[in-house]
Amino acid sequence: MKEVAKEIIKIDIEDELKNSYLDYAMSVIIGRALPDVRDGLKPVHRRILFAMKVLNNDWNKTYKKSARIVGDVIGKYHPHGDTAVYDAIVRMAQPFSLRYVLIDGQGNFGSIDGDSAAAMRYTEIRMSKIAYELLNDLDKNTVSFFSNYDGTEKIPEVLPAKIPNLLINGSSGIAVGMATNIPPHNIKEVINGCLAFIDDQNITLKKLMEHIPGPDFPTAGLINGKRGIEKAYKTGKGKIYIRAKSIIEIQKKTKKKSIIIYELPYQVNKARVIKGIANLVKEKKIEGITTLRDESDKEGMRIVIEIKKETKAEIILNQLYSLTQLEISFGINMVALIHGQPKVMTLKEILNAFINHRRKIIMRRSLFELNKIRKKIHILEGLIISLDNIDLIINLIKKSSTLEEAKNKLKTYHWYSKHAQYTQILKKNAHSLTPYDKKLRPIDTQKFFLTPEQIQAILELRLQKLTHLEHKKLISEYKQLFKTSNNLENILKNNNILTKIMKDELIKIRDNFGDKRRTKINVNYSDINTSDLINKENVVITLSYSGYVKYQLLSSYEAQKRGGKGKLAVKTKEEDFIENLLVANTHDIILCFSSKGILYWMKVYQLPEASRHARGRPIVNLLPLSSNERITAILPISEYKDSINIFMATSKGMVKKTSLYEFKKPRTKGIIAINLKADDELIGVSLTNGNNTIMLFTAQGKAVHFSEILVRKTGRTAIGVQGIKIKKSDKVVSLVVPKKHGNILLITEHGYGKRTEIHEFPIKSRATQGTIAMKITKKNGIVIGTMQVVNQDQIIIITNAGTLVRTRVLEIGILGRNTQGVIIIRTSKKEKVVALQKANALHLNSV
């Protein structure tokens, strides 16, 4: 058997996994996922731009096929798939992805709807004008290069980057164990911030944010609040909220409202937003939208959302912000590579790193240019020396038998020149010698040795240079280069001069590429709830027996005298009638108790506002009611308190007391409020403080009055205890929690009513048959409702035909318990009173 290996090294698999994974992680972090703080580019983007530079694919040259660039990148610099490289190119060319595109694309490069770009064989690209500033001076030894994957090419480790690209275009990427998400900014603001930081490196963040107030996204939008921005700039991490920009349009003729969305948050897909809105409408999570269409064109974005007349556009818009990507959170995590290591960086650290990078670039560029100029000066000096001694040089060359002899004679001769001076200056500044300067051998003020480079240039000198004019030109160029050399030396020696050059270059970039901010920052933003958009108004809420609900402004009803005919409050079908009526504020929460003892939550303003003649909307469309379940009691509340109880009564005389605090957490599907027997239902709900008295009234005119203390507090799912004993033919119709002042108002089905003093109802024990509250006859009919009233009150009475009358309590007489009352509302033969509610006189406005 042949040997598989000559030597087997045993290693711990745990250690090998750790080391291998660490190597992989660092490779991803440094070589793929994170940008360099200096030029703001990941390796793939840097290599794409470098490949375009090598191909001379500049902004002012013709376009080249994307496939050509992709081929060069993966063949020379980036040994990865062509899809990854082309995807990077596409993103660099998308104006909705980058604040300042680095590639000028021609063809289909995708859309904000998420459409894919055309294949690379169809699209053409070239470098954008601003990208050229990233690569400018690359050929002046400004950055270091390293070998590519096979050692055949050289790649820059970073670009010179005249622009602060990391901030103006941002970056995002997921590495191993870390990620980065840096938002784009406005170039004018960032450069102004750079200039301020250069002038004062101890500048406060508050002062710096006067120049750089926050991110500026290519898709514009609205940033709500500055707290997240400040935190991100201070710590490197933060969260901001970006909202779409919208307006509400009102048609002149129809007065119909439409919500127009004309800017979306950054990186939000327009098509998905529209689809999401459509799904919300379909699932009835948002009510009131009639039409949804996309009218976007080359002029800009325009999503039109038409809504119903009776629907408040502000509420719909707030729901859209809450339920769709019209408002998103953007987590800022400013992680970048600095000195080859990933680091979470603050705004000042990023600016400082960029400025230090620019200092090094300018110094290396200046040194490169100085060496180049000194080399040229060196050659020019040799030519000037030769022209000053042209006759002697020609004679030496003529007398030489070979080229080598001529070079040797020129090299060893002591030459005189009245124009050459560079070598003498260098003699006085020996500390600044470059490799080219060290080749010079000064003798004295006006005598020189020629170097091999100078001798070669002399031997290659064209005869036309021997003219007097050409001689003067050489001397002029020599002096000009000498001045330039001095300037470059000053840059290297004087930090203030270098700083001025850096600032001048930044100002030039700002002036050439600066534009207006797109994203608006709402500095004084505070979270806006839907309720903030709703006026606080008192409304009449009606719920029909068939489950149609709506509200109307209370001020739309005028008070009438006793015996009035009333005003139509709601149009119902013949078989339907109003079962619940209450007055509440638009900002109240209504607790909706169903016939099955389930409690549902709803804001008053979430109910449909409708006219008097409208039936409203089925409440089953607003609440997740099951089959054979209907809302039987509604209780408006403004806040939850543990000291307050919800007291419930059923038609079979059962009562229950539970803390209001137990109902504070709304659930979409509702919660159990009371366990009911099969033939029982909830008829009344009220708030108590633990020391109230309770009154229950039956349809047959009986009443019981007992202390709340007799009913102990129980949990939500309890069945309760007996409050009043009733006959099988009777049922409880009202629950009253009496206050200190006022009377008890009773209304019958035939429109009779009366007021009775509370003290006429003695406080006794619960679970008794009670006392007579009203004399029941065929003339007045059974009791349909009772309530406590005071002299200033007004009441609203409604019939099963939809007729509503509003009258003052003072017009209703005070009578004893064993009386049938007086006519309050005249009803027709088939018409019956079905609901009673109090309207506070302080809130009434006659019309």
Swiss-Prot record:
Name assigned to this protein: DNA gyrase subunit A
Intracellular or extracellular location(s): Cytoplasm
Gene name of this polypeptide: gyrA
CDD domains cross-referenced by the UniProt entry: TOP4c (cd00187)
Motif (GyrA-box): 560-566
Catalyzed reaction equations: ATP-dependent breakage, passage and rejoining of double-stranded DNA
Coiled-coil regions listed: none
Keyword Coiled coil: no
Keyword ATP-binding: yes
Highest taxon, organism lineage: Bacteria
EC code: 5.6.2.2
Pfam families recorded: DNA_gyraseA_C, DNA_topoisoIV
InterPro entries for the chain: GyrA, GyrA/parC_rep, Gyrase/topoIV_suA_C, Topo_IIA-like_dom_sf, Topo_IIA_A/C_ab, Topo_IIA_A_a_sf, Topo_IIA_dom_A, Type_II_DNA_Topoisomerases
Subunit note: Heterotetramer, composed of two GyrA and two GyrB chains. In the heterotetramer, GyrA contains the active site tyrosine that forms a transient covalent intermediate with DNA, while GyrB binds cofactors and catalyzes ATP hydrolysis.
Domain Topo IIA-type catalytic stretches: 34-533
Location of the active site: 122
Top EC class of this enzyme: isomerase
The family this protein is said to belong to: Belongs to the type II topoisomerase GyrA/ParC subunit family.
GO biological process, one term: DNA topological change
Record SMART domains: TOP4c
Additional note from the record: Few gyrases are as efficient as E.coli at forming negative supercoils. Not all organisms have 2 type II topoisomerases; in organisms with a single type II topoisomerase this enzyme also has to decatenate newly replicated chromosomes.
A Gene Ontology molecular function term of the record: ATP binding
Function: A type II topoisomerase that negatively supercoils closed circular double-stranded (ds) DNA in an ATP-dependent manner to modulate DNA topology and maintain chromosomes in an underwound state. Negative supercoiling favors strand separation, and DNA replication, transcription, recombination and repair, all of which involve strand separation. Also able to catalyze the interconversion of other topological isomers of dsDNA rings, including catenanes and knotted rings. Type II topoisomerases break and join 2 DNA strands simultaneously in an ATP-dependent manner.
